């Protein structure tokens, strides 16, 4: 999937970059964006597939999530509470997200360039659907995905 070249060359005029839908200008930052990642020897269709699968210890169910056709289906499977969540999920979910994001932005040079080009803007997953990973739609959410992307951006700039 090509990154829109005009975004990479875009001179940052705003201090906040909102993203959410994969069709938005910065939609490639979404975990639903169709950028495959390779983690621990397996290829995942999206970072959403990887993240949702890591909620479970059942290897068979994790593999089912990896093989589904869309990130929306993977997200739905990740919310299935008939399957037991791993007990330490709340304490490891940000670590899992960091691993997914690092894989995504290290394995796709054009995405890495896009992320680096956003500095020093604040990145915000702008959605009413999530007040933990996003801003809750009103700016009062935790925006953890945005903060993890900014953290990764800093690390990649140092490693450059």
Curated annotation (Swiss-Prot):
EC assignment: 3.2.2.-
Molecular function terms, GO-annotated: hydrolase activity, hydrolyzing N-glycosyl compounds
Enzyme class at the top of the EC tree: hydrolase
InterPro entries hit by this protein: NADAR, YbiA-like_sf
Highest taxon of the lineage: Bacteria
Outcome recorded upon mutating residue 133 to A: Loss of enzymatic activity
Pfam families in the record: NADAR
The keyword Iron is assigned to this record: no
Gene Ontology BP terms: bacterial-type flagellum-dependent swarming motility; carbohydrate derivative metabolic process; nucleobase-containing small molecule catabolic process; riboflavin biosynthetic process
UniProt KW keywords: Glycosidase, Hydrolase
Catalyzed reactions per annotation: 2,5-diamino-6-hydroxy-4-(5-phosphoribosylamino)-pyrimidine + H2O = 2,5,6-triamino-4-hydroxypyrimidine + D-ribose 5-phosphate; 5-amino-6-(5-phospho-D-ribosylamino)uracil + H2O = 5,6-diaminouracil + D-ribose 5-phosphate
Phenotype upon gene inactivation: Strongly represses cell swarming but no effect on cell swimming. Cells lacking this gene show significantly reduced FAD and FMN levels (both by 13%).
CDD domains, per the entry: NADAR
Purpose of the protein: Catalyzes the hydrolysis of the N-glycosidic bond in the first two intermediates of riboflavin biosynthesis, which are highly reactive metabolites, yielding relatively innocuous products. Thus, can divert a surplus of harmful intermediates into relatively harmless products and pre-empt the damage these intermediates would otherwise do. Helps maintain flavin levels. May act on other substrates in vivo. Has no activity against GTP, nucleoside monophosphates or ADP-ribose. Is Required for swarming motility.
Similarity annotation: Belongs to the YbiA family.
The protein's name in its UniProt record: N-glycosidase YbiA
């Amino acid at each position: 999937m090509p990154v829109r070249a005009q975004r990479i060359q875009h001179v940052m005029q705003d201090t906040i970059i909102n993203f959410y839908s994969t069709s938005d200008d910065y939609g490639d930052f979404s975990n639903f964006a169709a950028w495959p990642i390779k983690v621990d020897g397996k290829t995942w269709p999206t970072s959403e597939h990887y993240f949702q699968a890591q909620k479970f210890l059942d290897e068979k169910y994790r593999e089912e999530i990896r093989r589904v056709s869309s990130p929306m289906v993977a997200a739905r499977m990740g919310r299935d509470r008939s399957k037991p969540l791993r007990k330490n999920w709340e304490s490891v979910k940000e670590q899992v997200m960091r691993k997914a994001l690092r894989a995504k932005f290290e394995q796709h040079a054009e995405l890495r360039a896009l992320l680096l080009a956003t500095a020093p803007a604040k990145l915000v997953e702008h959605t009413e659907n999530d007040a933990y990973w996003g801003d809750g739609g009103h700016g009062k959410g935790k925006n953890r995905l945005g903060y993890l992307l900014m953290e990764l951006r800093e690390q990649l700039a140092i490693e450059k």
